[in-house]
Every structure is written in C-alpha cells, then in structure tokens.
C-alpha cells in the first residue's frame, strides 16, 4: 500500500481553499450578461469555447493533491446543480466559494466548525422558504422567452424559439436540440407521433421525389412478433384490399417471403402496404406498441394474450388520417383513438414517471407522454463553425432546462437580486449560540456574492452597486447588460426559483462539509523508481 501524506487543521484548510479558489475563479468569469468565455484545450480536435460553468468545472484537475481535493468538492456543487435544474452551475460555484471563504475565516478566528455548519444550514433552510414565498408562477410565453433569453446569455432568438416550441407542443411536449445545417436557428415541430424506425424495404416508397412512403387514412396492424410466413397475414390483407385502403404493418420484424409478397403486392398495385419495425426493445417495445394502439384505436396482436394473426379482423386494426414513413422515421398523424383512452394512458405513464428511479427511464417515459399528448419540437442550432455550434448548443440546452424549471416552480427576480432580498429578510434570524449566529451571518453575507460577481464581470464597482440594490426593495435591482437600475421583472431579467434554490442548497451542503474538515489524507507523490542497474551484479 502506498504511503500517505496527512495534513491537519489550518494547513489542510489553507490548501483546500486554494484549490476551491482556482476552480471557482475559472468558473465565475462566465457569470452574468457580460461574463466572458473560457477556452478548454482538448486532446484532439479544436479547443472548446464555453460560457457554461459546469463544463469549465469538469475540465479542472490540479497537480497538488490537497488543492485538487478542494477543487473536486466544488466541482461536485456545479455537477449537482446541473443535474437538479440544468442551469445555475456558476451561481452555485460562486455561492460555495463565498460560504467556504467566510466560513474558514470564522474557523480561523476560533469559532466551532460544527456550530458554524448548523448556523449555515438553518439560514439556508429559511432562505429556501423565503424564495418560495417570493416566487411567481411562470405561465405566459413572454415570461418563458425572458427566462430562456437570460439563461442563453442574453440571446433573444434562443429565448423566443424556446417559448414558441413550448407554445406548440405544450409544457409536457419534448423539445430536443440538434445541430442545424444553416447559419440561422430553426424550429421544427413534428405533429403526431414519431418514432425512429424507417421502412423495411425501399420498394414501398410511393413519393420518389421525397424518398418517403405517404399513406392516406391507412389501417394500422400492430403485431408483437416476427412475421415471416405470409399465410398468417392473408385474411387481414384480403379484408384490407376489399376495404380499398392502404395498410401499415408495425411488427417486431417482417422478413423472408412475407416481406417479398408485400413488396410484390405493392408494386402491382393490388394493395398499398408499408412495413416498419416496432420502436424500442423488450418491455419498452411492448409499451410503445400499446401507446400506438391507444393512439390509433387498434389492438396489439400478441401471442402473450392468446391472439393469433390469422384470426385478426379489421376491428383489431388501428386507423390514422395519414402516415409518413421515410428512411429513419415513421410519423403517425391524427390517430383515431378515443380522447378518453389516450388521456387514461397518459395518466398511467405519468404515474410511472413519479415512481421511476433512473433519469434515463424518466426521460424515456416523458418522451412517450409527449408523443401521446402533444408532439415533439426540435430546435436546430445554426452556426458558422463547429466550435461555435458546440458552444451555442450548450447554451440552448441550458436555456431549455431553465425554462422547464421556471414552468415547474415559478420565477424570482434575476441578477442576484432575489438572494439579496432573502438575506435582508433573514437579517434578524438567530440560533442557539453565538457560533451558530456567526454561521447564519456567513450564509447571509455569501448570498450577495452572485450579484457582486455579475457587477464585477460587467466592469463596475461591486460594493457601490450592492449597496444601491440593498437600499431598494422588492424587484429593484441592477441590469448589468444596460447598466441601469430598475425593476428586474420589467427588464425581463428572471431566474427560475428552482435554479436559485438548487444552487444555494448544494453550495451550502458542500461548503458545510468543507468548513468542518480537520484532516486531509492523500497518497504520497511517488518518487522516481530506483535504477535497477545500480544494484550491481556479482562478478
């Protein structure tokens, strides 16, 4: 086992604070409308340019093991804030740095670290309640656009695109961000249900100019099995041909003679058919087939429930106004399923979302709700170079998370003002003893840090602006972009309550642990390996 290097007390804390400051100073230059970019070197490809706090934090590793421990703990703050609300990572880092710096000063002055932590925790718990009281619901698209704009670093087009996307697909809808092809940002809304499976044979294409299969008011056969024997399908095919409508087959797979016969029938014009694989795998495939059945008013033909394909009738088939299938996707537009059944299915999936334990499962379930309830919007990010594209995509992603958080828990005045107001309200808060009271003061003083940093990045004097803002009340604050004082809500500078709350909670959690650290243990740096030749051989 490698030898360990151990540091105690003030020695350990000084080293740790140095690491915290290196990381926090690198991250906090990005805060606010006049925050700067950080360039990150990559081992291959062009460097990445970013204004996203968590991306900067993730890149930082320090050579000194003790300093690195401090940096890694603050990195955890940024990551946690990012996971919880998708934004506010820089604010969380600035708050953590402020609480740690003030807290360690108090420890050096002889305060009890455990009592300090209790005081900080008490102040933060009260601050979270105050934030909730200040919070205003965010429902109209103007407010949504403003939140998106602020989070995308004052990029108005991004804010408007997100608001428009939410308008079109609803609050439940799925909005994804992709690379665009041009220089402009675009919004693409997919009505109906789309899944990522294309046609099984290019011979089904009936619109050669677009390379797609378009079928008007088709029947939809849903089978949870592989179809390779055409005999199983003959009764259904004959019934569909009699009805004079096209048929879409969605099955685990269609292969061999079954696929060949369908292609021949289509080419001869006997019956228009198109076959696609069912989306997903395993249990998720079964669930998605059931979703499609609910949407189109059909039944999934599955041997698990004793149904056979040969005995299927037209009543078992779903219907839709239109189905469009291209190489990679299938879109079902206006299924004829009953609204009550669709809402029931959505309710069922929402229940599963509440019980889901992994983020991946939750995301997939939310996608299913969106496909049933609203639709899917894709924001295509345009840029001149790939480096700019990456940077912009990260900002749009942040803005999207921020607007979702705003819709969820409401908004408060932005620009660091909400935390300043909360701190002023809690000025009279006291705890069981003097050391805990100092802890409360440490947390309340730290709540000014985001405002001061925004002002400092804008090249103004933080103390002057902070005093002016504190002298005002309500939503009165400082707009760093235009260098004006006024009502932050009127300026359109809003922060999602969830983002501000998460930033404060995670910052205080990690800072409290670091203040109470008394000893640090790390591996000794390995010396150079001894030179084997020097041992000498008996001659």
Curated annotation (Swiss-Prot):
One CC-aspect GO term: cytoplasm
The effect of residue 167 to E is: In strain: JCM 7000
UniProt-listed SUPFAM superfamilies: GroEL apical domain-like, GroEL equatorial domain-like, GroEL-intermediate domain like
Resulting phenotype, residue 160 to Q: In strain: JCM 7000
Q: What is the effect of changing residue 248 to L?
A: In strain: JCM 7000
Where along this sequence does the record place binding of ATP?
30-33, 51, 87-91, 415, 479-481, 495
Show the Pfam families listed in the entry. Cpn60_TCP1
Q: Which Gene3D superfamilies match?
A: GroEL, GroEL-like equatorial domain, TCP-1-like chaperonin intermediate domain
Biological processes, Gene Ontology terms: protein refolding
Which key words are in the record? ATP-binding, Chaperone, Cytoplasm, Isomerase, Nucleotide-binding
Result of altering residue 130 to K: In strain: JCM 7000
On the tree of life, the source organism's domain of life is Bacteria
Enzyme Commission number, as recorded = 5.6.1.7
What GO molecular function annotations does the UniProt record carry, in alphabetical order?
ATP binding; ATP-dependent protein folding chaperone; isomerase activity
What catalytic activity is recorded? ATP + H2O + a folded polypeptide = ADP + phosphate + an unfolded polypeptide
State how changing residue 184 to Q affects the protein, per the record.
In strain: JCM 7000
Report the subcellular localization. Cytoplasm
Effect noted on mutating residue 98 to S: In strain: JCM 7000
Annotated CDD domains = GroEL
Tell me the outcome of changing residue 524 to L: In strain: JCM 7000
The function of this protein is:
Together with its co-chaperonin GroES, plays an essential role in assisting protein folding. The GroEL-GroES system forms a nano-cage that allows encapsulation of the non-native substrate proteins and provides a physical environment optimized to promote and accelerate protein folding.
Similarity comment: family membership: Belongs to the chaperonin (HSP60) family.
**Subunit relationships:** Forms a cylinder of 14 subunits composed of two heptameric rings stacked back-to-back. Interacts with the co-chaperonin GroES.
Q: What is this protein called?
A: Chaperonin GroEL
Show the taxonomic lineage.
Bacteria, Pseudomonadati, Pseudomonadota, Gammaproteobacteria, Enterobacterales
